[in-house]
Every structure is written in C-alpha cells, then in structure tokens.
C-alpha cells in the first residue's frame, strides 16, 4: 500500500466537533476499502489566502494515510460530494514524518514568544540619528524657511 499525506479544509461555520466527525466519516470510508489512517493533526481555524466557495477561513486537518489508490480515490470522491469540505489535497510520500508537522511546530514557536514580534525602535521622531553619512545641517537664511 502507498503512503499519503492528506490535507482537508472544512467550512468555517461548522464546529470543531463536526470537523472531527467528518474526519471519522472519511476514516470509515478509507478503512472499508482496505486503508488505514495514521496521525491526525487539527490545525484549527485559519484564514484562507483567497476565498473558496465564499469562505475566508477554514478548519485545516492533516491526515497520514496508508492505503491503496482505489481507497484514496473513493475517499476523495466522497469529499467532493460533501458540502462541508471546501477543498482537499492528497500527496503521495515515501514515508510519513515523525512528530509534529511544520505547521504545528510554527504555531508552538509563536506561543513561546512574548507576544510582541515587532523590532525595537529608538525613541524619538523622524530623525533617529542613524544617518551618519550626512554632514551637519546647514543653517537657514530666513526664519520662515522659504526659498533658496
């Protein structure tokens, strides 16, 4: 049997429990056709890069699959029929990754930060004094600063 990674995008207006039920439904379809589900990672509700079926957000779920191609094709057919599934992608891999995926690792790294990702800036207005290549400022000839 071949190894696959499958990412499922579910509508934003359903609950996480309904997403879990969807995954269980597709797990049943896959197992009925001789396949096995591996690791299941819920990435949560995330914004989409572009609208899909009038949705701006979706629940992302990653699933590792060990199944024959016919079982994966049947699962994908069922997903096309289901109105709660916005999109999906199945990729054949040589081996499944151990541990968390890169998406979950990135999310954990963000939680470890102090919440302020912006770089520190010096106090002051527009002139921060970081233009050492300029010489001293020329004095103005008149008070209003008009003309040259």
Swiss-Prot record:
The UniProt entry, under CDD domains, shows:
bS6
Pfam families according to UniProt: Ribosomal_S6 (PF01250)
Q: Where is this region: Disordered?
A: 96-148
Query: In Gene Ontology terms, what is a biological process of this protein?
Result: translation
Could you tell me the keywords of this UniProt record? Ribonucleoprotein, Ribosomal protein, RNA-binding, rRNA-binding
List membrane-spanning regions. Answer: none
This protein's GO cellular component annotations are: cytosolic small ribosomal subunit
Instruction: State any single GO MF term.
Output: small ribosomal subunit rRNA binding
Q: Which InterPro entries match?
A: Ribosomal_bS6, Ribosomal_bS6_sf, Ribosomal_S6_plastid/chlpt, Transl_elong_EF1B/ribsomal_bS6
Q: Which family does it belong to?
A: Belongs to the bacterial ribosomal protein bS6 family.
Function, as annotated: Binds together with bS18 to 16S ribosomal RNA.
Q: Which NCBIfam families does the entry link to?
A: S6
Which HAMAP family does its entry note? Answer: Ribosomal_bS6
PANTHER family noted in UniProt: MITOCHONDRIAL 28S RIBOSOMAL PROTEIN S6 (PTHR21011), SMALL RIBOSOMAL SUBUNIT PROTEIN BS6M (PTHR21011:SF1)
Q: What is this protein called?
A: Small ribosomal subunit protein bS6
């Amino acid at each position: 049997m071949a190894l696959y990674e499958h990412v499922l995008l579910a509508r934003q207006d359903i609950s996480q429990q309904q997403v879990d039920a969807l995954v269980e439904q597709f797990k049943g379809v896959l197992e009925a056709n001789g396949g096995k589900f591996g690791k299941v990672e819920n990435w949560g509700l995330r914004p989409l890069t572009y609208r899909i079926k009038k949705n701006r957000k979706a629940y992302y779920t990653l699933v590792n699959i060990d199944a024959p191609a016919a079982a994966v094709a049947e699962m994908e057919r069922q997903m096309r029929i289901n109105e709660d599934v916005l999109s999906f992608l199945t990729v054949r891999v040589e081996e499944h990754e151990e541990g968390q995926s890169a998406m979950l690792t990135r999310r954990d790294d963000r939680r470890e930060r102090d919440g302020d990702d912006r770089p520190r800036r010096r106090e002051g207005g527009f002139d921060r004094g970081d233009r050492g290549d300029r010489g001293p400022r020329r004095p103005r000839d008149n008070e209003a600063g008009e003309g040259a």
